[in-house]
A protein has these predicted regions:
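Active-site loop/oxyanion-hole signature of alpha/beta-hydrolase fold enzymes
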Residues: 55-85, 121-126
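Gly/Ala-rich beta-loop-alpha elbow adjacent to hydrolase catalytic centers
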Residues: 88-92, 96
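Flexible "cap/lid" loop of the alpha/beta hydrolase fold
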Residues: 103-148, 175-179, 184, 204-205, ...
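Catalytic His-Asp charge-relay segment
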Residues: 191-197
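Conserved loop-alpha-helix segment in the C-terminal half of the alpha/beta-hydrolase fold
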Residues: 198-230, 243
Length: 248
């Protein structure tokens, strides 16, 4: 594995003994994080899946644009034999939509943006503004950041104080270009997809969620906020493990 490629994969080498991309054959699960956060936000889900013997890769984004983020995930997917299960949370849905994956794989949109042709994150968000808009700001470099007194209430109100505090440590800035670009392709048109709706999601407007969810082959609703990967990692693990088993 090249040094450049190893940077595409999140903290799995540190947390899981350097087993990055050692697998060949079978079904792998690729996890893609949301805006202004790091891949470590998936730690609870990744640990749960690996505890069940699943093959998991967490990809770090923040490459400067949506196209670069998509290329980083594509590089990892290309090293894994299809079928793969690719799960994108929040902004991660923009990324997984642009992947070149075949009909034997599966896309899971976890409270995520699910764009059609020509739709950027900014365009989707402005169509039906949700609570996330109240958190968006820019830093001195002009990059997007999430902050404000309502951050916990909007992003993860259904987690404990320790989990919320840990999640805040994973926040970082992200290049605005990531939100201006549309995906290079729309993978869900040929690859089976599942959309997970959080009934108490305050980050995305429900009208937008319903519009995007209607594009998926399967829709599941959970009684969660925008961040079930933190509040109900057990549900996410069960869903991805079942999807993985269905493709094996």
């Amino acid at each position: 594995m090249s040094r450049r490629l190893s940077r595409n994969v999140s903290h799995l080498g540190r947390h899981y003994g350097g087993r990055n991309l050692q697998y060949r054959g079978g079904v792998s699960i690729v996890l893609v994080h949301g805006r202004c956060l790091t891949g470590a936000v998936w730690d609870l889900v990744a640990e749960g899946l690996r505890g069940r013997g699943r093959r998991v890769e967490v990809v770090e984004l923040h490459r400067g644009s949506l196209l670069a983020d998509t290329a980083a995930v594509q590089e990892v997917v290309d090293l894994l034999e299809e079928p793969v299960v690719v799960c994108g949370w929040s902004y991660g849905g923009m990324v997984i939509t642009g992947l070149a994956v075949g009909p034997s794989s599966h896309l899971v949109y976890l409270c995520a943006l699910m764009p059609a042709e020509g739709e950027s994150a900014i365009e989707l968000g402005s169509r039906h503004p949700g609570g996330l808009a109240a958190l968006v700001d820019t830093d001195e470099a002009g990059d997007l950041v999430l902050r404000g007194d309502q951050l916990d209430e909007i992003l993860w109100p259904d987690v404990g104080s320790e989990t919320a505090a840990a999640a805040r440590t994973k926040l970082r800035s992200q290049a605005m270009q990531s939100f201006r670009e549309a995906p290079p392709r729309v993978a869900w048109r040929q690859t089976p997809s599942t959309y997970v709706v959080g009934r108490r999601d305050r980050a995305f407007h429900r009208h937008l969620v319903d519009e995007m969810a209607s594009r998926a082959a399967t829709v599941i609703e959970w009684d969660t906020s925008h961040s079930p990967l933190l509040s109900r990692p057990d549900l996410v693990v069960d869903l991805l493990a079942r999807t993985d088993a269905g493709l094996a």
